[in-house]
Amino acid sequence: MSSIMEKTDVSSSKHSFTFEPSSDEVGKAAEIVDTHENFYDDQGDIDNPEELAELGYKQEFRRQLSLFGIFSISFSVLGMLPSVASTLVFGLWYVGYPGLLWAWLIAMFFLICVSMSMAEICSAMPTSGGLYYAAAVFAPKGWGPLASWITGWSNYIGNIIGQPSVNSSAASMILGAVTVNRPDFVIQRWQWFLLAVAIQCFNCVLACLPTRIISRINGVATYLNTAFLFIAGITILAYGGKNHNFVKGTKIWGDYINTTQWPTGFAILLSFNSPIWTMSGYDAPFHLSEECSNASVNAPKAIVMTAVIGGVVGWIMQIIVAYTLTDIDSVMNTSGSMWTAYLVQAMPPKAALGILSLTIISAIIMGQSALIASSRIAYSYARDGILPFSGWIGTVNPYTQTPVNAVICNCIISILILFLTFAGTVTLDAVFSVGAVAAFIAFTVPIAIRVFFTKDADFRRGPWNLGKFSRPIGLLAVSFVALMIPILCFPSVKNPTAQEMNWTCLVYGGPMLFTLVWYAISARKWFKGPKASAHYKRPGEESSDIVEGVQADIPSSSDQLKIKGDL
């Protein structure tokens, strides 16, 4: 493209005009470009493409996501209502009521630290590759490709597994809703599978739409998710107050019911699985940054907003559930969904069915947002030649200007994973359990390298940064994840059966071991990290040429000032 910005449409006016700049004005425009000021139109179509070019990539997406738009997708990925429903087992099963409250409260602090460290990196390197690009840049000389390879594959495994797990959960809740009015209904595995595939295909269609439409859909979805949370919380409290069924505060804050064979303190750490799994999607703004206006500011803000708002809302929901869960034994011993058993206990069947319906809608919204985020990861990796069939996957659709092929690829992989429904719940749960572990390993690798190996003088901070608190906050984030990853791989008993075993190590370690062997035998010879990472400009360095094949055209100053629109 010869010029990125030759005309700008101002949709709010009715008269056309053309502005021809004087030589002084052209000089001022050049000065603006040199100081990396944001230059984009009111629609957010263009946002400092030279900034992306300095990172080595060509602007291929339309930047139509505002701060609210990118936050909407990220918040939808968290899916607070279905996430609370799905992770109720982790909070209750290990230590009872306190697992709901203390796990969220303590873990939330450290998860926000992780989000802040990630956001700082995002501000400095707002690319779709995100974490794996940063790992290559921060790593000591010679280690960049391996650090990037590990981060990239861990991130992709976490996202590609997390997305079908959401749709499987939604399908399970739909079938579970049938049993509320028909207790004799027996759920068949083929029904579960076909329903999950139908939801997956529906989400695939939505994820293929242009960014502008995706932004609007997820904007509405955010309002719906917020309304559903409010309705669910008020309804639960209303029925609890009507029936005078509130649990005493001393019981929910201090009555530990340790069902594991580990010490109570360790069991509490096991219950951290609930907030960690819920928060494993707040990296979405990083991967959508190339579609976001003012990305170096809005994308990191969206990451932190998602973590803080999601954490607070999630904790409030945990408190509501804890105070209204009068018969904890019946919920913990149910053969079906704990969430369904809890709702039926807390309110009449029709009201329970209504709240369950809202949870299902939120889960479907969550699934499409997760597919959007995972497709951007696949696109960015294919752009750098990591994935098989990268030439096809890394293509941007010329009509929608979104990575449609990456969406289709991830949809196919998700459907293949859903075939594990026929292998039984133990196998399915084992696969779906690795999502949070894989995601947080990917989150932490670049943060750890930044904290321990990268000098402050070598880190070109973005406009959103932590200043002098960067390293301390990063150290807290890395320490928390380093502690939790092994713990999340433990079973709840000391001599587990196949059903009691935590298969996370095997299910995550197997694919990662395969990728490491692949790297050792073949990939190390041709994979040198993200193609553009070698062109990252550190403080004091001159701008380097954009890597061949991903060159971005920088508009001239006069081109940027040629504005044609409607007054």
UniProtKB/Swiss-Prot annotation:
One of its GO terms (biological process) is gamma-aminobutyric acid transport. It comes from the Eukaryota. The keyword Membrane applies. It is a multi-pass membrane protein. The keyword Nucleotide-binding does not apply. One of its GO terms (cellular component) is cytoplasm. This is Uncharacterized amino-acid permease C1039.01.
